[in-house]
UniProtKB/Swiss-Prot annotation:
GO terms for biological process: transsulfuration. The modification N6-(pyridoxal phosphate)lysine is found at K198. Keywords: Lyase, Pyridoxal phosphate. Disulfide bonds: none annotated. InterPro entries: Cys/Met-Metab_PyrdxlP-dep_enz, Cys_met_metab_PP, PyrdxlP-dep_Trfase, PyrdxlP-dep_Trfase_major, PyrdxlP-dep_Trfase_small. This is Uncharacterized trans-sulfuration enzyme YHR112C. Its cofactor is pyridoxal 5'-phosphate.
Amino acid sequence: MVDLSTALIHGDDKDNRVTDVAPPINVSTTFRYDDDDLIPWTERENLDFMEKKPVYSRLAHPNSTRLESIFSEILDGYAVIYSSGLAAFYAAMVHYNPKKIFIGQSYHGVRAIANILTRNYGIEQHPLEDIEKCASEGDIVHLESPVNPYGTSSDIESLARRAHAKGALLIVDSTFASPPLQYAWNFGADIVLYSATKYFGGHSDLLSGVLVVKEEATSRQLKDDRIYLGTNVANLESFMLLRSLRTYEMRITKQSENATKLVRFLSDHQSEFDKVLKTIYHSSLQTEEFVKKQLVGGYGPVFAITLYTKEQCKQLPLKLKYFHHATSLGGIESLVEWRAMTDPYIDQTLIRVSVGCESANDLIKDLASALKELQDAA
């Protein structure tokens, strides 16, 4: 396997059928049949032919195939691309069809899907603490690490042992620390999930998701299911995601370094903002041994802080120059979000910080200035 930077640029070379150096935007939804390959659907052994000879873009199209080639190489498995991270999670639930789902702290959208499955099909939801007591063969254990919105890490290897001892499968959502920061396969994950909207996309202008599995047959079934779920990534988004992947390693490395510097500054100077800054959450502040073992390439670019009042949470974003007050994360621009705006389950004094590719020094000065204003007013 070549290095990450090379795979990001050349992992789809084998799928290239044009002389364009940059992949073209394929807007067609339908493609002419090959006159030399007129074989009825019922006589096909499988649907792999659509990746080389596309038929209809809901099934596959040139740039979705290129994306899956790159993701399969850089994520060391069989990748299936989707229209969003939540579409990828839902596809996993449809495919594995568990009777019980064990979920810890996680993105509220995942919880909403779990609630739909419970309401419609009676799937049981349990906390991670109940694995030993309640889990059985074929159940799903779902873990985010690092977790949204805190950016803190959980022990993947320990949870994998607990899940596998009961015959359950472990899905790890590694969106907040995609490679080269973390390789969830190495710690026992059975399925790895990413919202490609975030760091892989990296420009706050597309939606996509990826599931990565270990067996080719599983990926084939997921792709077949995707045809009828209608959740393939769209043509324009796939082109934009291909463009973004070329620079992904440079961006994620810079963002990781910046976030670690910001967290270190806040931790070192917390006493200067003692009327405002209550708590700082980030993997770099954790002392457990597993954290550095998992995050081999650096800490995630998201962290969270809690302030003392809701009013301070409203005011902080207004005082920042280089952080947009917006939801989502992973783009080259830094964002802050008073998380209560979009997450109904969260502490209403929590601010999530998604660190971009600006100068770390400028970001530190900006955040320090805003906190000082609130400190002086407290």
